[in-house]
Amino acid sequence: MVDNRRTFTAPQSLLETNLTFPNDEPSLTTITVTRERCVDPSLIDSFLRFLRHGSDDIIRQKLNNYRKGSINGKNKCKEFLKQELYPNWQIRNNIISFCEKEAAEMKNETDQQCGNNKKTTAEPLIDARIDPYAARERAEKQEAQYKDWTKVTEWVANNRKIEQILTSTTEGILRQNCEQNNDYLKEFTQFCKDNS
């Protein structure tokens, strides 16, 4: 197992907002993501919540703030997208992708440990008349070995769905407040290609 880790920092625009947090709950502005954090994602979930709140949850307020300082509405939207929203989405996407890659590596490692590759021979099946619990024990053993992988893949799928819902909702708000004919999700994909 390779010790993979990536550090992510919240966009500067989130760090300078007028949002205040109680003293007993410091805001999480930087996170180092590892396989262990993907398996137990409570800290990652907090960081993603912070990022989501700082952009998608308060998008109307953010757009209003940009509107005050800009004469041209299209420029305020472009500025908001490039400086705040798209970098935020990209960080969230990168965190989820990191855990997705870790899950794939976990599956490969577990397959090799369990001998589930088609190239290796599986342990012999025991006749149910000799040991009636053998099949169940074998299934439980395999399930236990794949538990962490299953947990991470379910977390990734759940967060991909959350991101899909948030980005489509945000795109609707952007179409109402900015340019109706823009495809903001395609623009985000291009933004990621340009900034990777």
Swiss-Prot record:
Its main location: mitochondrion. Changing C114S: Loss of MIA40-dependent import into the mitochondrial intermembrane space. A motif (Cx13C motif) lies at residues 178-192. Present with 768 molecules/cell in log phase SD medium. The Cx14C/Cx13C motifs are involved in the recognition by the mitochondrial MIA40-ERV1 disulfide relay system and the subsequent transfer of disulfide bonds by dithiol/disulfide exchange reactions to the newly imported protein. Belongs to the MIX23 family. This is Mitochondrial intermembrane space cysteine motif-containing protein MIX23. It comes from Saccharomyces cerevisiae (strain ATCC 204508 / S288c). The lineage of its organism: Eukaryota, Fungi, Dikarya, Ascomycota, Saccharomycotina.
